[in-house]
A protein has these predicted regions:
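Extracytoplasmic gate region of multi-pass secondary transporters
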Residues: 15-16, 200-256, 347-352
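Conserved MFS/SLC helix-loop-helix module at the cytosolic interface between two early adjacent transmembrane helices
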Residues: 46-85
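Cytoplasmic membrane-interface "Motif A"-like loop-to-helix N-cap segments
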Residues: 57-67, 263-278
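Cytoplasmic helix-loop-helix junction between adjacent transmembrane helices
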Residues: 90-129
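Juxtamembrane intracellular "pre-TM" segments in multi-pass secondary transporters
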Residues: 174-207, 406-417
């Protein structure tokens, strides 16, 4: 199960470490390079809801196998593409296969584990999947620098074929069934499931949580982090790969902790999301405000903050799971998963356009160019923050109306525990 997501993340992030090589190979500027990743994410995001509907009908196994083979085809095409057209088609295939993988893996979790363990297992799934970023940051980057472009991407394609075979041999949709199919698809059923999932404010809270928490880390890992560190901050390729590896390892360490917190404090999940968003904003603020190039220690702080975004965005899927019945879980999960990738593709495109505007389309960036371009993330984050605060209010009202559960203000709860009084300080 997890291996499918590991390889999907490898495919998804492969362009990030190959960004500078891709500019040389295809003779394109930052805007055109960004368009590769934007198109990949656009395909991914556009397919989330259709894939979610198909997932509820056909089950996880079929979609995971199909997704792995489609991504493998995309990477094989990328290996031998010598022009922009081939590269664009390759990233479209990668985005399409990727769209079929993650939510299919997530749907397996409640089928195999009791409900009380789902938050932690969901985080562990995301944690293991991030090994794909390690594979792109280290061995794939080493293959690019050594054996070359074609060998690197053929190797990535081979990994996709291997995962498809492994899933066919070992994976089951549930302990009871190898392939679990839902009811036959009809237009009325599709429309009803989609409308009901969207109408629930808990689903939309999940979408905005995913939108806001995920995109800074995705933008960094998928395409702009490596060029920012190398061309902007002046790090060596090895040092940049090291920071990307730190990004992955930090996310892996944070995931289980966040899962336990969600499990123990289900009514305070949104505050975890808001805290992670604040960490992302402060991390970038420190780097952008630093005069000139930031020292390595400051860049480490940025990477540590951004690494929390991936595990934090997984809380959005918990909102989808707990606010929707099992028969439309795939649809609700697909809606939530659209959020972070829409935000990411908008940010990636805007950063590329700003860099091109400042350098005339040449790959001659300096740190000032990157600082101006990266600051656009604050505008996107502000939109997401507004969405979270509004839908949280609506979701809490719905929770009280449907289940009689009232979420008390956090400040009131903390005040009762003595956090805002001298009594608490005296006890510490």
């Amino acid at each position: 199960m997890a291996s499918a997501y590991v390889v999907a993340v490898l495919h998804r992030t492969s362009l990030g470490v190959a960004g500078l090589d891709a500019q040389v190979r295809f003779d394109v500027g930052a805007g055109a390079l960004a368009s590769f990743a934007v198109l990949q994410l656009l395909v991914y995001a556009a397919l989330q809801v259709p894939v979610g509907l198909l997932l509820d009908r056909f089950g996880s196994l079929r979609l995971i196998v199909g997704g792995a083979l489609v991504m493998a085809a995309g990477q094989a095409l990328m290996a031998f593409a010598d022009g922009v057209t081939g590269a664009v088609l390759a990233r479209v295939l990668v985005g399409a296969g990727d769209a079929m993988t993650f939510i299919s893996v997530l749907r397996l979790v409640p089928q195999w584990f009791p409900a009380r363990r789902v938050p932690v297992v969901t985080q562990l799934t995301g944690l293991v999947g991030q090994l794909g970023q390690v594979l792109s940051a280290v061995p794939l980057a080493a293959l690019l620098a050594g054996a070359g472009w074609s060998t690197a991407f053929v190797s990535a394609a081979a990994a996709g074929v291997f995962v498809a075979i492994l899933a066919l041999v070992a994976l089951r949709d549930s302990p009871q069934q190898r392939i679990a199919s839902g009811d036959a698809l009809t237009m009325s059923r599709l429309g009803a499931d989609l409308a009901n999932a969207w109408r629930h404010p808990g689903t939309r809270l999940g979408l905005w949580s995913h939108f806001t928490a995920q995109f800074p880390g995705t933008v960094f890992a998928l395409i702009w982090g490596y060029p920012f560190l190398v061309a902007g901050e002046g790090l060596s390729r090895g040092a940049a790969s090291g920071l990307l590896t730190l990004f992955v390892l930090t996310g892996m360490a944070a995931g289980p902790l966040i899962g336990v917190l969600v499990q123990r404090h289900p009514l305070r999940r949104s505050w975890l999301v808001l805290g992670i968003i604040a960490a992302n904003a402060l991390g970038w603020g420190l780097v952008l405000a630093w005069p000139g190039r930031a020292p390595l220690a400051v860049l480490v702080v940025l990477v540590l903050a951004l690494a929390l975004g991936g595990p934090g965005s997984m809380i959005g899927f918990e909102f989808a799971r707990t606010f929707n019945p099992p028969n439309r879980l795939g649809t609700a999960t697909g809606i939530v998963n659209v959020g972070g990738f829409v935000a990411s593709l908008v940010a990636i495109l805007l950063i590329g356009l700003i860099l091109d505007a400042r350098t005339g389309g040449q790959a001659t960036y300096d740190i000032a160019d990157f600082k101006i371009a990266m600051s656009v993330q604050y505008a996107i984050g502000a939109i997401g923050l507004i969405g979270i605060l509004r839908t949280r209010k609506l979701a809490r009202r719905r929770l009280a109306a449907d289940h009689g559960v009232t979420v008390r203000p956090l400040r009131e709860v903390l005040a009762e525990k003595g956090w805002f009084s001298g009594e608490r300080i005296g006890k510490s």
